[in-house]
Curated annotation (Swiss-Prot):
Organism phylogeny: Bacteria, Bacillati, Actinomycetota, Actinomycetes, Mycobacteriales
Family statement: Belongs to the KdpA family.
Predominant subcellular localization, coarse grouping: membrane
GO molecular function terms attached to this record: P-type potassium transmembrane transporter activity; potassium ion binding
Keyword annotations of the record: Cell membrane, Ion transport, Membrane, Potassium, Potassium transport, Transmembrane, Transmembrane helix, Transport
Protein localization: Cell membrane
Coiled coil: none
Topology of this chain in the membrane: Multi-pass membrane protein
GO cellular component: plasma membrane
Residue intervals passing through the bilayer: 5-25, 65-85, 133-153, 176-196, 249-269, 283-303, 377-397, 415-435, 483-503, 526-546
Complexes and interactors: The system is composed of three essential subunits: KdpA, KdpB and KdpC.
Function field: Part of the high-affinity ATP-driven potassium transport (or Kdp) system, which catalyzes the hydrolysis of ATP coupled with the electrogenic transport of potassium into the cytoplasm. This subunit binds the extracellular potassium ions and delivers the ions to the membrane domain of KdpB through an intramembrane tunnel.
The protein, known as: Potassium-transporting ATPase potassium-binding subunit
Originating organism: Mycolicibacterium vanbaalenii (strain DSM 7251 / JCM 13017 / BCRC 16820 / KCTC 9966 / NRRL B-24157 / PYR-1) (Mycobacterium vanbaalenii)
């Protein structure tokens, strides 16, 4: 079987599985967020944190709760890393010293669901920090994104109210009822497939067949691996992430991991359709995501299977940076999926991809990661794109734009437009400043177009809360730790505030009945329009920088 055909079959099986769970998982999440009943475990948590599960919040109160919870989480994780040497299960001789700048960067990274790692995981953090710090944030940062998405959907579904639900209820339910059960099942499957789960020390030394000695780092890997992918977090227990055989041993576990990082994001549109009372609207949204995802998967496979140059021609594909047990096609599907979502985990070395293959990965993130995007973040991103699309359509026919019975007034379009200006501003400003500083340019291992691509990739990944890297620059410096940390903070929380403000504005409106001039937003025409607007927005914003980086390298 050819490599290309194997990749197509691998991808087809993945799509079939995602289609199969779309309805049941989407309906289950609808019930989770719309029931009035709380479990005993949830009531215990509410009492511990002092939350009233019956109280509703305005968009401002909801946003303040998100920010307060995230700030406390950041402070806890920051301190935990700095004092880890005094804690049980700490590493006796960490490979990477934990400086305040690195602790800040790492804490921000995991709290914002980015999981950018400027350190080697297995030689920096002990088991306690991995479990009580990083793994916990993998759960709750994903639950925060889902909560914000549900709040925005309530803004469309409700009328003449200022209330969007209760953040603490949405956070707890998303964690306990959705993320925890699926993660337990996924961890068992990964252990069955060969991923490790133990509490062995880092300093296990074994004798190899060649007579040398090798250190084998153990740890509770499978449990963290499951939520790493399911919550679109991406931070690996090991430095090489899912390319490590202890995290991702076989093609079977590789398939499971790709499925996990896509499954919730592709099922949330069904939840959206149920909540607004029109399932066809959910199908339209997932249709947009599917169109963009198929384009990305196809383009990545095409560019990575091209045989240009002596070595690629000899082996039939671009094999540099690819794990042999996965092959080019499966690695390309993983790379496209991890950048289409906000996951950022890797099973191959993105910096070694062909210039145009790397361009696709960059472009995936620059889409705003809406195809399907991160857990929760992808849904609220694509819904705001839908708002912009109906506004553009309204301009063309001279009517006040409407979406799901809500008028898109100047206030709504200002919020939506600002939402999509935030991330490009962070990315382009950060890249420009880094390239203008001689000290930061000295940390680049490559010059020319590829060096620019590496810096652009770093800020694109940080601002879009992805976390993957081209890895050709030295980022464990005070400047990069601080700058990328700020990019992650602003790239996460400014869009969340704008999305919640939009939700509050929409919830206060009444419902406008559809008329003969209303744009149908459940048909293929609308799917094509949203996909087109998305691609045009990204092209207009980033094309000059892409032309100087990966495009110039590809042409050369």
């Amino acid at each position: 079987m050819s490599t290309g055909l194997a990749g197509i079959l691998f991808l087809a099986s993945l799509v079939i599985a995602l289609v199969a769970v779309h309805v049941p998982l989407g309906d289950y999440m609808y019930r989770v967020y719309n029931t009035a009943k709380d479990s005993r475990a949830e009531n215990v948590v509410y009492r511990l944190i002092g939350a009233d599960p019956k109280a509703e919040q305005t968009w401002g109160a909801y946003a303040r709760s998100v920010l307060a919870f995230s700030a406390v989480s950041l402070l806890f994780l920051f301190i935990l890393q700095l004092v880890q040497g005094r804690l049980p299960s700490a590493l006796t001789d960490p490979g990477t010293p934990m400086t305040p700048a690195l602790a800040w960067n790492t804490a921000v990274s995991f709290v914002t669901n980015t999981n950018w790692q400027a350190y080697s995981g297995e030689s920096t953090h002990g088991h306690l920090v991995q479990m009580a710090g990083l793994a916990v944030q993998n759960f709750v940062s994903a639950a925060v994104g889902m909560a914000v998405a549900i709040a925005l959907v309530r803004g469309f579904a409700r009328k003449r109210t200022g209330e969007l639900g209760n953040f603490w209820v949405d956070l707890v339910r998303g964690t306990i009822r959705i993320l925890l059960p699926i993660s337990v099942i996924a961890a068992i499957l990964l252990i069955t497939g060969g991923a490790i789960q133990n509490f062995h020390n880092y300093d296990q030394v074994v004798n190899t067949l060649a007579g040398a000695q090798q250190t084998i780092p153990g740890g509770p890997v499978a449990s963290q691996e499951a939520i790493k992918d399911l919550g679109t977090n991406g931070g690996g227990f090991y430095n090489v992430n899912s390319a490590h055989p202890f995290e991702n041993p076989t093609t079977w576990t590789n398939w499971i991991e790709i499925f996990l990082l896509l499954v919730i994001a592709f099922s949330l549109p069904r939840t959206f359709g149920r909540m607004v009372g029109n399932k066809k609207q959910g199908y339209a949204i997932v249709g947009v995501q599917a169109v963009l995802a198929v384009i990305s998967w196809s383009a990545t496979l095409f560019f990575q299977l091209q045989a240009h140059g002596t070595v690629p021609t000899a082996v039939g594909a671009a094999m540099e940076g690819v794990e042999q047990r996965f092959g080019v096609a499966n690695s390309a599907v993983f790379a496209a999926s991890t950048t289409l979502t906000s996951t950022g985990s890797v099973d191959s070395f993105h910096d070694s991809y062909t210039s145009l293959g790397g361009l696709v990965l960059l472009f995936n993130m620059q889409l705003g990661e809406v195809a399907p995007g991160g857990v929760g973040a992808g849904l609220y991103g694509i819904l705001i794109l839908a708002v912009i699309t109906v506004f553009v359509a309204g301009l063309m026919v001279g009517r006040t734009p409407e979406y799901l019975g809500k008028k898109i007034t100047p206030r709504e379009i200002k919020l939506a437009a600002t939402y999509f200006l935030v991330t490009p501003l962070i990315v382009l400003t950060g890249t420009a400043v880094a390239m203008a500083m001689p000290g930061q340019r000295a940390g680049m291992l490559n010059t020319g177009p590829h060096g620019l691509s590496e810096v652009l990739y770093a800020f694109t990944s940080a601002a879009n809360n992805n976390g993957s890297a081209f890895a050709g620059i030295t980022v464990n410096t005070e400047w990069y730790n601080t700058a990328l940390g700020l990019a992650m903070v602003f790239g996460r929380f400014l869009p969340i505030i704008l999305a919640l403000a939009l939700a509050g504005s929409l919830a206060q409106q009444g419902k406008t009945p559809p008329s003969i001039g209303t744009l149908p937003t459940h048909r293929p025409q609308f799917v094509g329009m949203v996909a087109g607007v998305t691609l045009i927005l990204v092209a207009l914003t980033f094309l000059p920088m892409l032309a100087l980086g990966p495009l110039a390298e590809g042409i050369h």
